[in-house]
Amino acid sequence: MFRWFLLCYFFGKPIRSETAVVTWRLFVEMKLDTPWAILEASERQLVAVLHEGGYTRYQHVTARGLHVCMDRLVREYEGSLYFMLESSLDETEFSKRLQKLHGIGPKVAEIFTRETTEVFARRVE
């Protein structure tokens, strides 16, 4: 679930979608695919990966934003999007919680939550 979230995070930035995918793949290859791994990486390390992925602007802002987003996710939800989802009453609440994370707006939350509809549907059964 986190890898999908990370890709959605990149899709929400003012970059080409191809750049978002390349950057996401680099994060996965470099084992920067958990909130804790991103928090442990220095801003300089994140900037280098973002640059390698094709970011020509906003690398520092994005690196800092990732740190802020991951810090809150770890502090409030033990680093688990699944925990956030399970503690939400419905998709609307889940979307609102996502949007409290730095860098997550309504569109990113909408893209991400498309993949969680099934979880909420199972609760009703």
State the predicted function of each range.
Residues 4, 18-21, 92:
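A generic alpha-helix surface/boundary motif
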Residues 29, 55, 117-118:
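Residue-level marker of structural boundaries
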Residues 9, 26-29:
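Amphipathic alpha-helical segments that form the core helices of the histone-fold
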